[in-house]
């Protein structure tokens, strides 16, 4: 007697392999996405909601929905427009000088010399010191009576009398920008140094054989290959500097006479000094839009330059 084995029909999986592979990829991204939503998206939505209400902490009885009232107040606030102008000076003055000096430092650190490893390590020192500590150090250096900067400039004959750097409306912004530049140079130096080390030496050797000089090699080899790093690093610094308030809070508190008051410090003062969270929310939303606009404009401009090349 012959036994016949009937093959069972192959069951089709409920989810195809392609869909499962896609779901696996999304599952890896889910924790980061949830973290991003919790730390970025939710605070932005809460700030937008807050900006639509009259929310003064010591006047709970006045809490009510006012729509765009805080934004209309912002448009009519002369201090806001002053802080916006100061923010532009603060951001672009700081980032431009940080980039130029950081690029120069990266080119120097790329060269071979005795003690190069030690110098590269020391270059990071301004960057790893907390911002509050940097502010306290430079506040002491700028001190008019016993500060090192005044004493040094008088000794070398560049000044005849002591200057109150942080108390002068004409000099305070330059002083805090210089401090921020000193702290931010290592960021660009290390980023660009990493890019320089990735450029193949064969390109420079071939260009030198063809008769290209130092400037030609820099312009046609170094700069184009470093452009992606420059774009990302500069955009990152623009965003960070727009939000960076530690130095100004410690060194000047936004003074004298709002000469160093930027939009981020003004927002914090409205929230935690005036306790006007509704107006602070409107300021934070506008600051976010300004940052996004400047970043988009910068990325659009740099992309246009790449396309023309």
What are these regions (language model features)?
Residues 1-19:
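Short, Lys/Arg-rich, polar N-terminal cytosolic tail immediately upstream
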Residues 21-309:
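A structural signal for multi-pass alpha-helical bundles of membrane permease subunits
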């Amino acid at each position: 007697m012959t036994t016949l084995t009937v093959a069972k029909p192959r069951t089709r999986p409920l989810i195809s392999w392609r869909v499962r592979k896609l779901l696996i990829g999304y599952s890896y991204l889910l924790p980061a996405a949830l973290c991003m939503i919790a730390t970025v998206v939710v605070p932005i939505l809460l700030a937008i909601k807050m900006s639509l209400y009259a929310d003064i902490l010591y006047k709970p009885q006045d809490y009510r929905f006012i729509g765009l009232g805080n934004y209309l107040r912002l448009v009519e606030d002369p201090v806001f427009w002053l802080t916006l102008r100061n923010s532009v000076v603060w951001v672009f003055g700081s980032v431009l000088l940080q980039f130029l000096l950081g690029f120069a430092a990266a080119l120097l650190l790329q060269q071979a010399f005795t003690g190069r490893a030690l110098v590269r390590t020391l270059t990071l020192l301004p960057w790893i010191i907390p911002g509050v500590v940097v502010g306290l150090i430079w506040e002491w250096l700028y001190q008019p009576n016993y500060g090192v900067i005044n004493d040094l400039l008088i000794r070398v004959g560049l000044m005849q009398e002591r200057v109150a750097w942080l108390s002068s409306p004409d000099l305070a912004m330059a002083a805090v920008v210089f401090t921020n530049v000193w702290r931010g140079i290592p960021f660009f130096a290390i980023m660009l140094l990493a890019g320089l080390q990735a450029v193949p030496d064969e390109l420079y050797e071939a260009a030198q054989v063809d008769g290209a000089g130092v400037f030609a090699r820099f312009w046609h080899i170094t700069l184009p290959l470093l452009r992606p790093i420059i774009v990302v690093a500069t955009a990152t610094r623009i965003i960070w500097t727009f939000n960076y308030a530690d130095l100004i809070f410690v060194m000047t508190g936004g003074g004298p006479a709002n000469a160093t008051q930027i939009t981020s410090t003004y927002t914090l003062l409205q929230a935690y000094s005036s306790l006007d969270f509704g107006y602070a929310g409107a300021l934070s939303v506008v600051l976010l839009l300004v940052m996004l606009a400047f970043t988009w404009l910068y990325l659009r401009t740099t992309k246009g330059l790449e396309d023309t090349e």
